[in-house]
Structures are given as structure tokens and as C-alpha cells.
Amino acid sequence: MKKLCPLLLILFALYGCVQTSNKANKKFSNVQQENFDNMLARNRDKSYRLGNKILEKEFNDSVKLAIGEYMDSVKLFINWKAKIHNINSMELGESVKLSFELKYTPEQYREVSFDVDYLLSKDSLDSDKIYNTIKRLNNYSTVYFDGFIRREANGEACYSSYSDDIMHSYPNFKFFVVDINTTSKGDILSDNLQYAVNLSFKAIEPLELSFKKKMSDKETKKRIAEIAPQFKTAKELLTQEEKEYVDRLTQALTYNFLYAE
């Protein structure tokens, strides 16, 4: 028994080191944000090992498409943490364009940015959650946000940065924001809201396919007629704040295919 005691102490000490190491290696409490950032870090590391411009272009194009496909898989980023920068607004006729950037810096010499343009009517300035949250913030404030990366017409992720030379170390994505808060709300949506969100993506699909001339008008109307009653019932189960969340999401999803280049 006396021989076992030192051994147990060593094992406990090693276990404690492993636990501490795992926590130290984690950059984010949000698992979804951690996984996405790890993917970006791997892409950055791979980009350093490419031997010529042809390989670089092929790799960069594959990354843009892979991130677009990644967004098809995860649908929404939920409760990600970042600093807000460059808050601004501009009047456009009867609308206001709110613009800002969301940035996080996971390590030295690497920064991830999301470039947001949020359009709303002047009539909704007093009631719109995004606008009223943003206008009370100072630049560099910490925020928690939901949303998704915009995509090009070919399915690639849409970048704001003009040079592929920095797309791995300093990626800057064009982004649709759906929710923003000054405190964490948790990384999981309520069951009712998640169901309505899933239906939102399902409902927008026939509209997008019709817009791209990939679905007939007859099939589009049929698909919409099938989804509409489910969507209506799902929204009736939501709180008012959740209904507004879904409205912002469906608007962003519509803009995503209408203005894809």
C-alpha cells in the first residue's frame, strides 16, 4: 500500500496536467466557434507549405468552396464572441444601412473578421433589436452574435478582403447578422426556435432554386404550399423576440441569394 501511494500521487498529478493543458489549448468556450477557428488555423498552416502560385490559387479556391459547404452544414453560428469595430450608419432613401465589423484574435498574427451590412427601414429604427443594441455600444465592445457567412452564387464563401495573400491569416468574411447581445445567451437555441430556424432554411430553398432557374414555378409553389402550414404553426409557438429572430433570419437568407454575385 505504501508503494502505491506515491504512484497514485504521480497519476493524479499527471491527470491534473492533462486537464490544465486541455483548457489552456482551448481558445473559446463556444465549441462551434472553437471548431471553426481550428479549421481556419489548419488552412493557414497548409497555405505555408505550398510551393508556387498555381498551387496557392487552387488551394485558396478549394478553401472558399469548403467554407461555403461548411455553412450549408452548420447553417448558423450561434452565440459567438467578438469585439465590435467601425460602427457606422448611412441613409439610403427610406432605409438605413447599419455597418460594423466583428473581430476576434485567436493568436498572434491571426485575426478573423466578419464584415456586416444590416439594412432596415426607417420606420423600424425604434423597434429593431440589432439597431438599438448597436447604437448603444462603443467601438471595441465585446458582443455575442448569431449569423452566417454570405455566399457567392457559385457556393463559395464571400470574402471582403481583396487579396488572397491574407485570406488565411486575416480572413475577412462578408456576414449576415441575425442576433447580437452584450452578454452570452448560451450556445443552444430553444427547441421551438431551433425548429422554426430549421424550417426557415427549408422554406427558403425552393425560392432560391426558382430564382436560379433550377426549379419550375409549379414545383416551387408545391414545395412552398407544403412548408407554409408547418412554418405558420412553428411561429405561433415562439415568443415575440423569437419571432423577430426568425424574421431577421428569413430576410438575411433571402438577401443571401438575391444579391449573390
Predicted regions and their residues:
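C-terminal motif of bacterial Sec signal peptides marking the signal peptidase cleavage site
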Residues: L14-G16
